[in-house]
Amino acid sequence: MVDLKTKAFDISQNFTIALDGPAASGKGTIGLILAKKFSLKYFQSSIVYRQLAFDCISQKIDVTDIDAVIALSKELKLDNNFDLENENIGNIASQIAVISEIRNNLNKYLINLVKTTPRMIMEGRDIGTVVAPDADLKIFITANPQIRAERRYKQLQAKGKTCILAEILQQIILRDKRDKERKAAPLLPASDALIIDTSKLSAMEVVEEVTNYIKNKIT
């Protein structure tokens, strides 16, 4: 049996990291650094939900028309030509993500991607519990909602986008509530996940903590 340290540092080995956590907890930044450090393909699972939200908008499908959204989710194709990171798309994605049929359809895409990619870090809300329960390493990132809102605010400002901190905080709190209370794969850490609160940690400090965990993990 190959140990975790060997899988992580030997690029000839298959190695999968499941990285979960709430919105704006720092998953994206941390995931990208880990991907580079361990030569992993990085994939943000929220992109499939954001793409579906964008498709609903562009095709003028009301998100309350659940049957229409479910049908659209079966035909999803990722298109990198559009900005899927704005808050409106994120909020719509959060609304449709609570629908179990939609999650099942989109998870088929994600599960296949994990199975066919030898070295991958997939980031999302239910990767360690649903999409990749057999991942070699499961990490759950969290942080105080106020700090997460401030981080998102700075990110959006850096991109030249107009935003209001209080509104971002309200959206994050609402999204957390949806994620935790949904019947289909609610947001929670896997029982064997490494849980890290990033409220007072930089991205590099989190990466260092993960690296030390990998080096010291006894299989």
From Swiss-Prot:
Keyword Nucleotidyltransferase annotated: no
Xref: Gene3D superfamilies: P-loop containing nucleotide triphosphate hydrolases (3.40.50.300)
Similarity field: Belongs to the cytidylate kinase family. Type 1 subfamily.
Protein name per its UniProtKB record: Cytidylate kinase
InterPro entries: Cytidylate_kin (IPR003136), Cytidylate_kinase_dom (IPR011994), P-loop_NTPase (IPR027417)
SUPFAM superfamilies assigned: P-loop containing nucleoside triphosphate hydrolases (SSF52540)
GO cellular component term of the entry, any: cytoplasm
Sorted UniProt keywords: ATP-binding, Cytoplasm, Kinase, Nucleotide-binding, Transferase
UniProt GO MF annotations: ATP binding; CMP kinase activity; dCMP kinase activity
Location of the protein in the cell: Cytoplasm
Cytoplasm keyword on record: yes
CDD domains documented for this protein: CMPK
Disulfides per UniProt: none
Broad EC category: transferase
Pfam families: Cytidylate_kin (PF02224)
Organism: Rickettsia rickettsii (strain Sheila Smith)
Chief location: cytoplasm
Amino-acid positions noted as binding ATP in the UniProt annotation, renumbered to this chain: 21-29
Reactions that this protein is recorded to catalyse: CMP + ATP = CDP + ADP; dCMP + ATP = dCDP + ADP
Coiled coil segments of this chain: none
EC number annotated for this UniProt entry: 2.7.4.25
BP-aspect Gene Ontology terms: pyrimidine nucleotide metabolic process
